Structure formats: C-alpha cells, structure tokens
Regions:
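Conserved catalytic-core motifs of GNAT/GCN5-like acyltransferases
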Residues: 101-103, 113, 118-136
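Conserved acetyl-CoA pyrophosphate-binding loop and the N-cap/start of the following alpha-helix
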Residues: 78-87
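A conserved beta-strand-loop-helix scaffold within acyl/acetyltransferase catalytic domains
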Residues: 29-73
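Conserved GNAT acetyl-CoA-binding A-motif
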Residues: 93-106
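Short amphipathic alpha-helix that is part of the acyltransferase structural core
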Residues: 1-32, 123, 133-140
Length: 140
C-alpha cells in the first residue's frame, strides 16, 4: 500500500465518495451534496492508495470546545488495516481542546471504543427520517 493522507477537498472525486458510502452501507447523497458537506466542515481527511480514494471522514466544530465526527468510511477491502483509526485520530488531533461526539453505525461501536470513545447515556437526535433511523437501529 502507498497511502497518502489529504487534509483539504482539492481534486476530490465526489462520485468516488458516493460509491464508497454505498459500499459500506452508509447514507449517501449526490456528489455535490457531499462536496458541500466536506467543504463546509472544520476538518477533513481523505486517504488514497496511489490515486484511488479508499477512505475519508470529516469533523464539524465550533473550534473552541465542541466537535462532531461524521462520514468515516473505508472501502471494505481496506478495512482492518488501520486506515479508519488514522482518519479518526487525525480528526481528533485537528480539533484540540474539544469534546468530540459521533454516532457509530450499528455494529461498529467497538471500533470507536478502541479509540477511547464512550457510549453516551443522554444522547438525543431529531432526524428528518426518524422511521428510517429507527429501522436501521440508530434510535429506539
């Protein structure tokens, strides 16, 4: 592997972002919507193997004391090689002095627990598609 980390949105193929999200069974939108989300984020990380995008993630933050990590995804063929860990660690490092929260895809909680994230007892959410989030086990 010849991995390269990128910390901006320059020359990203947003269609590849969509395809990776589909392959890992995460929510996806059009490439333009993902471009807007990543461009407007506080911190972004993209990981490529040679010229092929293999993973990414982003954090939104007030830059003072709160941050939220979203859209951490790694191609299935690259999972288990430390790439997700690199993405999460880079996002946490880029939001110093911040509490960092996220919601994990069901079944992926242990991955984040290895990075010292802990389950919250009082987390609440207001989702646009509440039924889908309940069906996908994100909410009770």
């Amino acid at each position: 592997m010849n991995l390269r980390l990128q910390f901006d949105t320059t020359a990203i193929d947003w269609n590849q972002v969509v395809e990776i999200l589909k392959k890992v069974d995460m929510a996806y939108y059009t490439g333009e919507i993902h471009q807007m989300a990543f461009t407007n984020s506080h911190s972004v990380v993209f990981v490529s193997d040679d010229e092929n995008l293999v993973g990414f993630g982003r954090a939104i933050s007030d830059g003072a004391y709160q941050a939220v990590i979203y859209d951490v995804a790694v191609l299935p063929s690259y999972q288990g090689k430390g790439i997700g860990k690199m993405i999460v660690q880079a996002l946490v490092k880029n939001t110093p002095h911040c509490n960092v929260i996220l919601y994990a895809s069901p079944g992926k909680e242990a991955f984040y627990e290895k990075e010292n994230f802990r389950r919250m007892k009082t987390g609440m959410a207001l989702f646009l598609d509440a039924k889908r989030m309940q069906e996908n086990r994100f909410t009770e």
